Structures are given as C-alpha cells and as structure tokens.
C-alpha cells in the first residue's frame, strides 16, 4: 500500500499503434459532430478543460473510438485486460490507451496505445470487492466508524485501487484496508480536501423543491409508457414527496433508492412539457442518447447552484462512504459542483446523457470549485441503471 496527496504514479508507456491512421479514417463523421456541438458547450469545454475549438474534432474522434472499441479491446486482452481510458498528450491531442497485465505490447485494433501493468482489472476488482465487503460487515455502534474515509474505486490509469480519505485521516484509510483483508500492494491511499457529502439543501439554475423544504436539480426528461417524468438523485426525496418548480406542484417521487444507490424518478402531471435538453447558462444542450463515456472523456454537468461546469471522467464503480450509508457503482468526475446541484445532469459534448449528480468533497463554502481539479471528487449515479430499474425511456432530440 502506498500513500499520496495527489495522483502521481504512472504506468510505463509501451507502444503506439496507428493512431493517426485510425483517426483519419473517422475524420469526416467527427468533423460533422464537432460542428453540431453547441457554441456555449464549446466555450465551457475551453474554459474548464482547455479544449479549444480547433482541438475538438480530434477529441471527438478519440471519444468515438473509445465508445466503439471498448468491448473489443476487453475481448482482445481477455483475463489480462487491465482497463482502458482516454489520455491527453503534451501537445494537447488525445489518444485511447489500453492496459494489460500480460506481455503483449500492441493491439490488433487500430488507434490503441498499449501499456503493460502489474495487475489485471479482475485482480483490482477483487480487492475492491473486499473493501466493499469490509464496509458492509460493519455493525453500527459496535464496529469502529469509517470516519475520514470518503470513497474507494479501481483506477486503471495508476493500476491501483484508490481509497480517498479526508486530509489528516491517512491512518483511518490504512486501518480500513487492513481490516478488509484486501492486498495492500494493490491499494493507494489518497488524501482529498473537503468532506464527502450529498449536495441537496441549498438554494438556486433549473431547480425543483421537495415538500417546500429542500432544493435539488432536475436530471433528464423520461417517460414510462404514457407517464411523464424526470430522473434525479435518490437522496433528494422520499416516495410520494411533492416536487415543485417555480412554486407550482409538478409531480411526486414515484420511486427512489438511497443509500446503496442514489437514484429516483419523479412522476409528473400530464400538463408538463418534456424537452430533450440540458440547461447551459442562457442556452441548452440537446440530449441525443445515453451511451456511457470512457474514463478520461470530457463531460459536463448542470445544476441549480454552480450552473454548467465541465471536467473529465476520472473513475468508475466508485463506492462513496456518505454519512447516510455507502452508495456503490458511482462514476467520478472532476467538474466542480455544490450543494443543491444534486440530481442534476451529466452529459458529454456529443449529447450523451451520463447520469445524475450525487455528491462530492464539498468545502465549508458549499462547493468544491476552489479545489484543484486533480483533487475533486464529484460523483454521479449512472443513468442506464436508473432507466432499467424503473422501466423508463429517455427523451431525446
């Protein structure tokens, strides 16, 4: 086990296979996609990620490659597959990287850089499962509390399981790992500013209130048969809680799960109009689908408190140790967020809906926007499981 204050460990570079040729083959379609990106979204990506309009076509090409080749890459490397992600080069361009614990140094798939690492994804996931089991086995009032332990997840880029802890709580993280029985050599303890918490209960964007008491943000428009609705975070309200927008009752919470997961959907009255859009300041981003993006992909989020912010996906299958209980299967990004953004949308530049805001490492000012992007933990519940569990259809344009 090793301890760090920021992500510093890098796996060794091995080889690059035909990235230019692979991207050139997709250039026509990607250029069209870049032209379709909302101007306000381009501005936000440049502001938050340093992706300039001239770099956007090549980024979109790489993002498309990651989406279309992810399953094939995993099949190619089999049991020795150690993950894949999008990475930015020093010159500002992007590439798709795949890792393997085997000896192979290249891929038969064009446009994929291969890196050799120590542990397979299956080995790291096993350590992750031991941490989850250790947390589940704790008995409230009997077991030592997990105070100071924020979250844990597999990070393919550093080939480790990362356990995030509060500043000054490294010992708590070490104890947690030791008691779980996980292989400490596969784990990195990383300190994180702020305190992990869900993000409801402060005022603000496109918002809705719950029982005239707390405030959250709308996720995405959905339908269930003829019933209209929207998805949001489960911690925002209980079943049958009333949702209001602009003071008017628009519906009630039809179902929710929290903790364990952090998902819910609100059933709306028939008078409401569903739009396939996400607010982006004075403009809107059209929702075009719900294909999940890769680690390293650019992603933006919208909420009533901090508005429209962009970042990248930094981890998947994260377990968050909220005060209310552990929530599993979250995705982590580094777009900044604040209290009240809960339930709000996460979406890619290509209009692919990703999920709804859950929580993050919030500072005393109510957000994590002042924390360096490399240390932000902004967590969202994936959209696809919400749609599947409740039999919902995403409204797209």
UniProtKB/Swiss-Prot annotation:
Presence of keyword Disulfide bond: yes
Swiss-Prot/TrEMBL GO biological process terms: proteolysis
Record-level GO cellular component terms: extracellular region
Annotated catalytic residues: 235 (charge relay system), 262 (charge relay system), 342 (charge relay system)
Propeptide regions on this chain: 25-199
Enzyme class, UniProt record, top EC level: hydrolase
Family: Belongs to the peptidase S1 family.
Protein's recorded name: Alpha-lytic protease
Organism: Lysobacter enzymogenes
Gene: alpha-LP
């Amino acid at each position: 086990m090793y301890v760090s204050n920021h992500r510093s460990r890098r796996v060794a570079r091995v080889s690059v296979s035909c990235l230019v040729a692979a991207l050139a083959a997709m250039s026509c379609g990607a250029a069209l996609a870049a032209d379709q990106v909302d101007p306000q979204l381009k501005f936000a990506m440049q502001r938050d990620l340093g992706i300039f309009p001239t770099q956007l076509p090549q980024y979109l090409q790489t993002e498309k490659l990651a989406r279309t080749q992810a399953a094939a890459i995993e099949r190619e490397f089999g049991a020795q597959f150690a993950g894949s992600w999008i990475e930015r080069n020093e010159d500002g361009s992007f590439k798709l990287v795949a890792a393997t614990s085997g000896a192979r140094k290249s891929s038969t798939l064009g446009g994929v850089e291969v890196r050799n690492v120590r542990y397979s994804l299956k080995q790291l996931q096993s350590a992750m499962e031991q941490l989850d089991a250790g947390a589940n086995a704790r008995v409230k009032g009997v077991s030592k509390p997990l105070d100071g332990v924020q979250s844990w997840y597999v990070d393919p880029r550093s080939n480790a399981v990362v356990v995030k802890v509060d500043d000054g709580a490294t010992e708590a993280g070490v104890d947690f790992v030791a008691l779980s029985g996980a292989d400490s050599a596969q784990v990195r303890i990383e300190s994180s500013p702020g305190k992990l918490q869900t993000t409801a209960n402060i005022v603000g964007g496109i918002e809705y209130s719950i029982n005239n008491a707390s405030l959250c943000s709308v996720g995405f428009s959905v339908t269930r048969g003829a019933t209209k609705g929207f998805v949001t975070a489960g911690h925002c309200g209980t079943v049958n809680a009333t949702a209001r927008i602009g003071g008017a009752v628009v519906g009630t919470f039809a179902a929710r799960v929290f903790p364990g997961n952090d998902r819910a959907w609100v059933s709306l009255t028939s008078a409401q109009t569903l739009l396939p859009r996400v607010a982006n300041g004075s403009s809107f981003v059209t929702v075009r689908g719900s294909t999940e993006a890769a680690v390293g992909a650019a992603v933006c989020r919208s909420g009533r408190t901090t508005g429209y912010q962009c970042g990248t996906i930094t981890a998947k299958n994260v377990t968050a140790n909220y005060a209310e209980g552990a929530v599993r299967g979250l995705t982590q990004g580094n777009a900044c967020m604040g209290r009240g953004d809960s339930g709000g949308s996460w979406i890619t530049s290509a209009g692919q809906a990703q999920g709804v805001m859950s929580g993050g490492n919030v500072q005393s000012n109510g957000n994590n926007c002042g924390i360096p992007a490399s240390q932000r933990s902004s967590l969202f519940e994936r959209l696809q499981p919400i749609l599947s569990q409740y039999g919902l259809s995403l409204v797209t344009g």
